[in-house]
């Protein structure tokens, strides 16, 4: 049986009474966002809107993005990535559990020095996936060119974010490449492994 979204008590600023709100609303009030599912257009639109709102409220305060995601849509993920780079607020990214594929890309896109992971996190990078359905050969060729273009763009960005060479990123992402939190730190995907909120 599904659990649903938990509710928690929250006192609005200036109010003497508490009310029950969903946990994500409460976390958002503390500038905490959570990517806890596959990246798709819906979650991307929600995260983009929340980042834009929080940045417009106070761009001097960081936004915390917790990630436990198997990855997902490249185009949806790039919408999140572009917004992370667009806002003035620092983006503190924190891996809790798994950051794979686009999840790992977004983890490493946080503000340099503020890309974090909990000790038992797993990070996985690989090349973008593309599907081939029963279509005309010319359509498949067009899609293949686009996938290769996206792969090159993602590899260049990841090389820049990690400090690794483009050639190393290209080689390592040829297949699923899993790293522990400590290995991800040494690789340059994150900056620190943390065990307590005060370390973020």
From Swiss-Prot:
Keywords noted in UniProt: Cytoplasm, Hydrolase, Protease, Serine protease
Top EC class for this record: hydrolase
A single Gene Ontology CC term: endopeptidase Clp complex
Active site, renumbered: 101, 126
EC number: 3.4.21.92
GO BP terms in the entry: protein quality control for misfolded or incompletely synthesized proteins
GO MF annotations in UniProt: ATP-dependent peptidase activity; ATPase binding; serine-type endopeptidase activity
Keyword RNA-binding annotated: no
Gene3D superfamilies (alphabetical): 2-enoyl-CoA Hydratase, Chain A, domain 1 (3.90.226.10)
PROSITE patterns: CLP_PROTEASE_HIS (PS00382), CLP_PROTEASE_SER (PS00381)
Catalytic activity: Hydrolysis of proteins to small peptides in the presence of ATP and magnesium. alpha-casein is the usual test substrate. In the absence of ATP, only oligopeptides shorter than five residues are hydrolyzed (such as succinyl-Leu-Tyr-|-NHMec, and Leu-Tyr-Leu-|-Tyr-Trp, in which cleavage of the -Tyr-|-Leu- and -Tyr-|-Trp bonds also occurs)
Complex formation: Fourteen ClpP subunits assemble into 2 heptameric rings which stack back to back to give a disk-like structure with a central cavity, resembling the structure of eukaryotic proteasomes.
Record NCBIfam families: PRK00277.1, PRK12553.1
Identification of the protein by name: ATP-dependent Clp protease proteolytic subunit 2
């Amino acid at each position: 049986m599904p659990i649903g979204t938990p509710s928690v008590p929250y006192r609005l600023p200036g109010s003497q009474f508490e009310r029950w709100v969903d946990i994500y609303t409460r976390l958002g009030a503390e500038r905490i966002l959570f990517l806890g599912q596959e990246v798709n257009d819906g979650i991307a639109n929600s995260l983009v809107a929340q980042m834009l709102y929080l940045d417009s409220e106070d761009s001097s305060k960081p936004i915390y993005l917790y990630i436990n995601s198997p990855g997902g849509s490249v185009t949806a993920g790039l919408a999140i990535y572009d917004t992370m780079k667009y806002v003035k607020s620092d983006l503190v990214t924190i891996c809790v559990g798994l950051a794979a594929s686009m999840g790992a890309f977004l983890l490493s896109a946080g503000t340099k020095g503020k890309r974090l992971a909990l000790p038992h996190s797993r990070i996985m990078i690989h090349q973008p996936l593309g599907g081939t359905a029963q279509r005309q050969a010319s359509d498949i060729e067009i899609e293949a060119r686009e996938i290769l273009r996206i792969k090159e763009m993602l590899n260049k960005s990841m090389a820049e974010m990690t400090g690794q060479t483009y050639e190393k990123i290209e080689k390592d992402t040829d297949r699923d490449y899993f790293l522990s939190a400590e290995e991800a730190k040494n690789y340059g995907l994150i900056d620190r492994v943390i065990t307590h909120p005060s370390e973020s």
